[in-house]
Swiss-Prot record:
GO terms for biological process: translation. Transmembrane segments: none annotated. GO terms for molecular function: large ribosomal subunit rRNA binding; structural constituent of ribosome. The lineage of its organism: Bacteria, Pseudomonadati, Chlorobiota, Chlorobiia, Chlorobiales. Part of the ribosomal stalk of the 50S ribosomal subunit. The N-terminus interacts with L11 and the large rRNA to form the base of the stalk. The C-terminus forms an elongated spine to which L12 dimers bind in a sequential fashion forming a multimeric L10(L12)X complex. Forms part of the ribosomal stalk, playing a central role in the interaction of the ribosome with GTP-bound translation factors. It holds the Pfam family Ribosomal_L10. HAMAP family: Ribosomal_uL10 (MF_00362). This is Large ribosomal subunit protein uL10. It comes from the Bacteria.
Amino acid sequence: MMKRDKKEEIAQQIAEKFQKSQGFYFTEFQGLDVQKMGQLRLEFRKAGIEYKVVKNTLIKKALRDAAGADKLAEGLKNTTAVAFSYDDPIAPAKIIKKFSKDNEALKFKMASVDGTVFGADALPQLSEMLSKTDNIARTAGLINNMIASVPMVMNAVMRDLVSVIDQVGKLEK
């Protein structure tokens, strides 16, 4: 059994992870064998996501000062592992959805993404969202297209103006 001061220390470390992360996801893994759990951890590690098995009581202590703590605490039943994402808050949703298709033992409980709490039914929507990198790339592409189209529009205006002047000149003759 863990001593109280050790539990407080672990709860403090978990609280720091919650604060640093842009998104965190609670999963249930009961029934997932060691090999599958290793594969899941590897997938998370490749994406720069930290995946930890944590006791529910320690998670509750770590969340006591967090926004939405009551709502998050409701989902803490059975075994819980937490995926902490520090860069891309949507990446864990994509991994969880993909991995749980072949491994029904992995269940999504809930998540907090940029301070918004999502329930167990939100995984499909979360996994379909674009990452920040994708959004930035899409926005940059739109801006680039707008910049590229400005000279074409200006040329069209000038061409039309020349055409109108030419037509007026022909009418006066």
